[in-house]
Design a protein with these regions (language model features):
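S-adenosyl-L-methionine
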Residues: 1-8
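A short SAM/SAH-binding and catalytic strip from SAM-dependent methyltransferases
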Residues: 11-32
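Short beta-strands and strand-loop turn motifs
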Residues: 17-18, 52-55
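Short catalytic/ligand-binding loop motif for oxyanion handling, primarily in non-cytosolic enzymes
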Residues: 22-24, 60-62, 88-89
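A short glycine-rich, Lys/Arg-flanked "PGG" loop and its adjoining helix->strand segment in the class I
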Residues: 28-53
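Short strand-turn motif at the edge of the Rossmann-like AdoMet-binding core
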Residues: 54-58, 83-84
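Conserved Class I S-adenosyl-L-methionine
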Residues: 64-88, 93-106
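C-terminal lobe and adjacent flexible extensions of AdoMet/dcAdoMet transferase-like proteins
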Residues: 98-229
Length: 229
């Protein structure tokens, strides 16, 4: 790749959009070759720059991207987004899980017309993605406190709201009962996939965390925005 782009050239951003999953077939060998290609892309990124990978939000393509992510992380690269967790991706533990983003989007009129004619809905853009740092750059420190990126839709149950969050401690269920709703935690009931939140006063419950009337929820970033704080 670097030879085709020109000897010694460096770029602020190198992007691969709906391309990686189309290359090298299937299986472990394909994943290894995709990881090697990403290393080539990262080698031509300037310090402080990024390689951005965007793939379809389907389960299989997403899980393949996460498997490539694990290989890249194992080789010493840092993920700028969406990951806070620095180990092997916890979404790969269960075959039914995957990770994708869902961003609200106002389509151009031409796209709206085509979508309407095809019977499609295009109120949002769904994708699986990685933003990777070049070799030698450290993981960015997450915001202070107990921080999670919401990686599910709202999982409503009888008298409660639940989400899956993924943060520095891994993938965790977060739940809050309506009877424990307060002004300090009310934002929990309005979260969207991709939001970054800070949680306080949460209690371990089963394989997740239960929020109480003492809990506070701070929204540090909405989906697609950089996390601050």
């Amino acid at each position: 790749m670097s030879a085709r782009l020109g000897e010694g050239e460096r770029f602020d951003v190198v992007g691969l959009c709906h391309a990686l999953n189309e290359l090298f077939g299937e299986g472990e060998q394909a994943l290894e070759r995709r990881a090697a290609l990403l290393e080539e892309a990262l080698a031509i990124v300037k310090p402080g720059g990024s390689t951005v990978v965007i793939e379809p939000a389907l389960r299989d393509t997403s899980r393949d991207l996460l498997a490539v992510r694990d290989r890249i992380v194992a080789r010493g690269y840092a993920v700028r987004a969406p990951c806070f967790y620095r180990g092997s991706c916890p979404a790969l533990v269960r075959e039914s899980d995957w990770c994708h983003a869902d961003h609200a989007w106002r389509a151009p009129s031409l796209v709206e017309d085509l979508a309407r004619a095809a019977g499609l809905r295009r109120e949002s853009l769904k994708m699986s993605y990685l933003v990777l740092a070049p070799k030698g750059e450290a993981w960015r420190e997450p915001p202070a406190g107990r921080v999670f990126r919401i990686v599910s839709e709202p999982l409503e149950g009888k008298g409660r709201q639940r989400y899956i969050g993924c943060g520095p401690e891994g993938r965790v269920g977060l739940a809050l009962q309506q009877k424990h709703r307060t002004a300090a935690n009310a934002a929990f009931f309005e979260l969207r996939r991709g939001d970054v939140v800070r949680v306080s006063e949460a209690e371990p419950r089963g394989d997740g965390l239960a929020l109480t009337d003492r809990s506070e929820i701070s929204v540090l970033a909405r989906a697609g925005d950089p996390a601050q704080g």
